[in-house]
Amino acid sequence: MYVPLVSREAVNTAELDRRALLGICQAAGIDEIGVFVFTLQPGEEDDATVFSRMFAPGFGVPEDPATGAASGPLGAYLIEYGAVHPDAGRAHIVSRQGVKMGRPSEIHISIGMSGGQIPQIRVGGKAVLVGEGTVRPG
């Protein structure tokens, strides 16, 4: 669920009421979903298009510092509702996430447009490394 807010302060102070979320999901007949709060308010310390946070306790993630899977659809949402305007058939959006939890990330969302449709979305960026490992078969 995408929830636009008016300011970075509102994003930073947002708290998820999980009981209310579960009630909404139950009333809609769906499983628990994540909640992505964001603002388009510019920041003084960065040039991000979007400042955001993602809450997904139903997936075992109280807060995610870099949600690539939610960022692509966010880009489509921003274009659909006129918050971002493509230039020459492309839009580039930068989402700053994870700041509140001390793990700032910068997610780049590149959107290709053709005939008013979105045939291509690419997501990449930078995140804080908190661990790494190797998986060996067998």
Please annotate each region the language model reported.
Residues 1-138:
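Active-site proximal loop and beta-alpha junction motif in alpha/beta enzyme cores
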